[in-house]
Amino acid sequence: AILIALVFGALPLSSPNVSMKEVAKRVGPMWAYAQVGMLLQWALVGLFGLYVIKLIWPDLNDAFGIMLPTGFYGGHGTAAAIGSAFEGLGWDEARSLGMTTATVGVICSIIGGLLMVKWAAKHKQTAFISDFDDLPDELRSGLLPEDKRDSIGEATTSSISIDTLTFHVALVFVVAFLGYMVSQTVKVYYPVLELPVFSCAFIIGLVLKKFFDATTISRYICPQTTQRLSSSFTDMLVACGVASIKLGVIVKYALPLIVLIIAGVAIVWCITFFLGRRLAKTFWFERMIFAWGWWTGTMAMGIALLRIVDPKLSSKAMDDYAMAYLPIAPIEILLITFVPILFVNGLGVWLLLACLVLSLLILLLAWKMGWWITRS
């Protein structure tokens, strides 16, 4: 969580000035894409578990199906939270199932993401890389030849007082810390509205960027340096995300779990690919591959896949997701809070149907707003 806050806290400081009207126009379709993607994953996979898997294995818990979106979309943290809630309500295996789907989701995000990147590069659907098999040597080896090396920034402070790199690192940490404080403050006064730290850090970064631009402070902030810092934090985030993978085997539920995972991967792929082509006017594949990594594994996996097809993050996919996630966070928190209670009381199907109906309403709004795009 700290590294994610640092990544998104540094983004606004390295972004060029754009009008809020332009941002809102750009983020609207991304909000619809991300919100519908979350709701449909819960609804479709949950209903598949209730009305297909339960027919084959009737002794399974009604909430068995929703343990896949718990692990895929939510990740290990959400799996632990919902699993613990179910354990308190009498279903002891929930945590293990959630952790298993979260781990499998990370693996699927990497393997499936790389296959999609190769397909997109081959069919000229990527904006920043060419054929996957003909990538430049520097992208394959990770080492730049002398004639292709860029400056990582310029000195804006005297090393007698403070080193430039230290100054910029401290600035990013301040942004992330303020984002954390805002998130915790909201949590104290409005416990249900638990805003993620990274979104708060991004908003704080935007506010400070406006303040810096209105004064002379921005003259001493190097965009290249903050961009490199964001990339460095991203590298550490990816490494920590991969290192945190915990492999587990649940023998008791092996067969239904395999069926659930196969069906879940297919459903999530259809949602990600179909909606990604129709709710992104620009850089549709870059936005879609980031969503795939996030919705099956973790945000770190999404960032890793995005950096393969967009090494310099020129598509602004991460910026847009940070803004779009703000109105999504409360709905996600409500799901995490009420899913165990509703399923234990036999009302889970109504929750899943509500997610499905809300998804259709958002898609209708996207069509009315002109966000829906028809691609061949």
Regions found by a protein language model. Give the residues of each.
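Interfacial loop-to-helix junctions that mark the boundaries of transmembrane helices
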Residues: 1, 92-101, 186-198, 221-227, ...
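Structural signature of multi-pass alpha-helical membrane transport proteins
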Residues: 1, 11-19, 149-157, 166-228
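Hydrophobic transmembrane alpha-helices of secondary-active transporters
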Residues: 1-25, 203-212, 227-252, 271
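Structural signature of hydrophobic alpha-helical transmembrane segments
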Residues: 1-7, 62-69, 192-204, 229, ...
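Interfacial helix-loop-helix linkers and transmembrane-helix boundary segments
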Residues: 14-33, 213-227, 244-258, 280-284, ...
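Alpha-helical membrane segments and immediately flanking helix-loop junctions
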Residues: 57-93, 97, 104, 116, ...
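Intrinsically disordered, low-complexity non-transmembrane regions of multi-pass membrane transporters
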Residues: 121-166, 213-217, 371-376
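C-terminal transmembrane helix pair
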Residues: 240, 247, 257, 261-371
